[in-house]
């Protein structure tokens, strides 16, 4: 056999092994070890041939929170959800971490699952992780979706009451408290239906140790993407709500203006419309991720 034929055969064998491994690993929820870090993950197979979508959640939220959005997303898209260390079902790490550490961990997760490249969607705290992944693991990241997120410590902040409320995980632990504060904290649909927010947070979220929440807060301490955004070269969809007390709307405009290949879409609603009204945003996200070539940047509205 010629060296060319051997190379082709080896390549085919490699991809066949990867495909077989992916097929074996497609279970609902399981724990995998990436390096030395256990991660609780869930993989939804897709019917298409594109790269998978990594979903990075907000602070304190486990992978189950994405269930309503997942049901509305194009089934062609393979989806990988994960609990960051210390959240949901992922064990508490030995020490705090930074966003760069988590981005490297996600690259290792892709290796473990046999994927060369992925898209990433991040909401709120997870949007910071998505930006970091796109910047520090740029060859592994094809497209980016940023939902209700900002640029870290250098951004237009929420009001002091909102920041103080976010400093603890109480809303994940006390359903009555969640109902009382939902409208003022999350805005949008939560103002009219705080019980829906309480239902999502308490039905779909698996609460981890309180120290895990503190580790997430520590990861964002001192972090900003602002000076690096011109280096984020992937096509990016920025989704921002016009009634978001946690991430004021202007922060989405800042992101879209500094990311070279970004388009901005402003939706009517608050911080967690992605899971409260998934039909509002899932079609836009599905179209962006499945189109052959993303369109030109747009200022949105």
For the regions a protein language model found, what residue spans apply to each?
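Flexible "cap/lid" loop of the alpha/beta hydrolase fold
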Residues: 131, 135, 141-171
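Catalytic histidine-centered segment of alpha/beta-hydrolase-like enzymes
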Residues: 269-282
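Alpha/beta-hydrolase fold catalytic core
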Residues: 1-53, 76-77, 290-301
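Conserved HGGG/HGGXW glycine-rich cap/lid loop of the alpha/beta-hydrolase fold
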Residues: 37-91
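Conserved alpha/beta-hydrolase catalytic His-Asp/Glu region
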Residues: 175-228
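Acidic catalytic loop of the alpha/beta-hydrolase fold
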Residues: 243-247
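Short beta-strand/loop motif that positions the catalytic acidic residue
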Residues: 232, 238-240
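Active-site loop/oxyanion-hole signature of alpha/beta-hydrolase fold enzymes
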Residues: 81-121
């Amino acid at each position: 056999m010629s060296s060319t034929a051997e190379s082709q055969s080896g390549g085919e064998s490699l991809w066949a092994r990867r495909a077989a491994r992916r097929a074996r690993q497609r279970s609902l929820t399981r724990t995998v070890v990436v390096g030395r870090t256990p991660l609780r993950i869930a993989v939804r197979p897709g019917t298409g041939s594109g790269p998978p979508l990594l979903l990075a959640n907000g602070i304190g939220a486990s992978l189950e929170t994405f269930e309503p959005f997942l049901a509305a997303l194009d089934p062609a898209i393979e989806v990988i959800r994960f609990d960051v260390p210390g959240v949901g079902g992922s064990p508490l790490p030995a020490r705090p971490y930074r966003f760069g550490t988590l981005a490297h961990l996600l690259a290792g997760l892709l290796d473990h699952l046999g994927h060369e490249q992925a898209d990433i969607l991040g909401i709120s705290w997870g949007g910071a992780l998505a930006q970091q992944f796109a910047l520090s693991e740029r060859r592994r990241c094809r497209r980016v979706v940023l939902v209700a997120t900002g640029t870290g410590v250098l951004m237009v902040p929420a009001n002091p009451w909102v920041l103080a409320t976010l400093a603890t995980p109480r809303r994940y632990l006390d359903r009555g408290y969640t109902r009382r504060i939902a409208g003022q904290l999350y805005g949008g649909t939560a103002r009219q239906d705080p019980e829906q927010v309480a239902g999502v947070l308490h039905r779909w979220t698996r609460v981890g140790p309180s120290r895990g929440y503190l580790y997430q807060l520590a990861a964002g301490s001192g972090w900003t993407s602002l000076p690096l955004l011109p280096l984020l070269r992937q096509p990016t969809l920025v989704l921002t709500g016009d009634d978001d007390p946690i991430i004021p709307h202007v922060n989405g405009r800042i992101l879209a203006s500094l990311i070279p290949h970004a388009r901005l879409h402003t939706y009517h609603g608050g911080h967690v419309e992605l899971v409260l009204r998934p039909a509002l945003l899932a079609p836009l996200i599905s179209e962006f991720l499945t189109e052959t070539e993303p369109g030109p940047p747009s200022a949105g509205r």
